[in-house]
Curated annotation (Swiss-Prot):
Residues 417-437 are annotated as: Disordered. It comes from Euplotes aediculatus (Ciliate). It is found in: Nucleus; Chromosome, Telomere. One of its GO terms (biological process) is telomerase catalytic core complex assembly. Residues 38-145 form the HTH La-type RNA-binding domain. The lineage of its organism: Eukaryota, Sar, Alveolata, Ciliophora, Intramacronucleata. Keywords: Chromosome, Nucleus, RNA-binding, Telomere. SUPFAM superfamilies: Winged helix' DNA-binding domain (SSF46785). The mature form of the protein is a protein of 43 kDa, which is derived from a 51 kDa precursor by proteolytic cleavage. It comes from the Eukaryota. InterPro entries: La_dom_prot, La_HTH, La_xRRM, WH-like_DNA-bd_sf, WH_DNA-bd_sf. This is La-related protein 7 homolog.
Length: 437
């Protein structure tokens, strides 16, 4: 299969390309035909090839509107070499290659076109047209935006589920967000109608799953078991060919036809309810003691570094209570620490008092202990959080705005009024800050 142009692939390609051209130019006759004024003409060839590959790469075409228009102007997606000779980077590379002869040959572009044709010959991503006057991609450029391609791909990190589990999840994926015009019904399986998997377990750290539409990614996220996954992340990755997608669909249909039970991959309501209850349980809390006097909350957050907690209770004392979103994040945080200690930066006054004989860490940082919290303190904090949430809910109920009261005033001054939702959010945030105070 022909590959898309990627910057990482181009970087990896450079040494191989250089070795190839350096061996071909080791002969004196081969170097003389290039009419080069530089000492090492073979160095310019891989540089120029790499630059041309970058111009036609997905990463550049999504950002460079001028070159994208030239590529999409013709059906072949070709760009004339004479147009590329106008680019500053190409001119500087040609000047580096030809040296003094560059000024003599500047009036005639035929010599430069021949040299660029020589550079394109060994490329994996671009090629010459039949008339050898233009360059085009080996694989056609997809005219969709980069944001769309990012939204079509899901990356699964953390504890990776098995291939079997992912296949069942894709097969049992239900189109919950289907439109009225779509053939699929809300409770009917998609049957791989526009859904395919790009790769399975090729990497030891993550799995990529590609979809043809953005709503299929959301559908897959809803139908996948929440216990099997620690992190969903949209990753920029171009789609594979439709031919390969069709083959993958047929393969998956054969492998998954034996699975009937969808309870493994569907949403488990018990797990979700337990997670919501677990958000306000004792297993989500930790206590930090021996904190330097006068420390602030942001200093504690910086010391915790990874998996920052969603809540910190600290009132300028030596102890602080931190709460994570769930127990999984708490255990992950404890596992990432070799010991039960964290380092918090001391204040300037305390640092000045310390002697110079101490090490850098002992002078500028203080080691604080991580301890378990007792049940009574946890219940007290949970009650405070619930009271705060209920007060915010009451504020939301009071701030239900009647559309009749707020008539649009664009008729009078010619400007649009802010939507009701934005006015609501602004008022809720203002009231919630007052409640916290």
């Amino acid at each position: 299969m022909e590959m898309d142009i990627d910057l990482d692939d181009i970087e990896n390609l450079l040494p191989n390309t250089f070795n190839k051209y350096s061996s071909s130019c080791s002969d004196k006759k081969g170097c003389k035909t290039l009419k080069s004024g530089s000492k090492s003409p073979s160095l310019t060839i891989p540089k120029l090839q790499k630059q041309l590959e970058f111009y036609f790469s997905d990463a550049n075409l999504y950002n460079d509107s001028f070159l994208r228009k030239l590529v999409l102007k013709s059906g072949e997606q070709r760009v004339e070499i004479e147009t590329l000779l106008m680019f500053k980077k190409i001119r500087s590379l040609l000047k580096e290659h030809y040296g003094e002869n560059y000024l003599i040959l500047k009036a005639n572009n035929d010599e430069y076109i021949k040299f660029i044709c020589e550079c394109v010959k060994g490329s994996r991503y671009i090629r010459l047209t039949k008339d050898k006057l233009a360059i085009k991609r080996k694989k056609k450029f997809d005219n969709r935006t980069a944001e769309e391609l990012i939204a079509f791909t899901i990356r699964i990190d953390g504890e990776l589920p098995s291939l079997e589990t992912i296949e069942k999840a894709v097969y049992n994926c239900r189109n919950r967000s289907s439109e009225s015009s779509d053939v699929n019904k809300p409770n009917k399986p998609c049957k791989f109608n526009g859904i395919y998997v790009k790769s399975f377990g090729t990497n030891a750290h993550c799995i990529y799953i590609g979809f043809l539409k953005h709503r299929y990614t959301e559908c897959f996220r809803d139908c996948f078991s929440l216990q099997q996954i620690t992190c969903f992340d949209y990753s920029c990755s171009s789609l594979i060919s439709l031919k390969e997608a069709g083959e993958m669909k047929r393969r998956l249909k054969k492998e998954i036809s034996k699975f009937v039970d969808s309870s493994v991959t569907g949403i488990n309501n018990k797990n979700i309810s337990n997670e919501k209850e677990e958000e306000l349980s004792q297993s989500c809390f930790l206590k930090i003691s021996k904190i330097p006097a006068g420390s602030k909350k942001y200093q504690i957050r910086e010391a915790l570094d990874c998996d920052r907690p969603s809540y910190i209770q600290y009132d300028d004392k030596e102890t602080a209570v931190i709460r994570f979103k769930n127990s999984a994040m708490r255990t992950k945080f404890l596992e990432s620490r070799n010991g039960a200690e964290i380092l918090i930066k001391k204040n300037c006054v305390d640092i000045a008092k310390e002697s110079n004989s101490k090490s850098f860490v002992n002078k500028y940082y203080q080691s604080c202990l991580i301890e378990e919290i007792d049940e009574a303190t946890a219940q007290k904090i949970i009650k405070e959080i619930k009271d705060q949430r209920s007060s915010i809910d009451e504020i939301k109920a009071e701030l239900k705005l009647d559309n009749k009261k707020y008539k649009p005033w664009s008729k009078y001054c010619g400007r649009k009024r802010r939507p009701v939702s934005k006015r609501k959010n602004k008022a809720i945030n203002k009231m919630s800050t007052e409640v916290k105070k």
